[in-house]
């Protein structure tokens, strides 16, 4: 049952990431892959926040922690899509855009993870 929960959580996270990506394209935000950026930023915040809350505030089991952090957030965030997007930008003649996207993604992702941890520690 534990493995099924991880699979379902991962699938749910992946589906939400896909829908987010489609929504950003439908909004006309095609200059950068904003769906991946938003998913990674939200996911980084949530992993910072939930990794603290699940253990220290809510006292959840290790299994629940794995389902939420590895399953759901692992499916929701994506480093592989980010990597492919960067390479595609560079190969399509936009190396500066690719480098800027790396800087934005990494810097903001670290900041969001830290913000999530800080918020959780204050509660």
Give the ranges of each region predicted by the language model.
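Membrane-interface helix-loop junctions in multi-pass transporters/channels
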Residues: 1-123
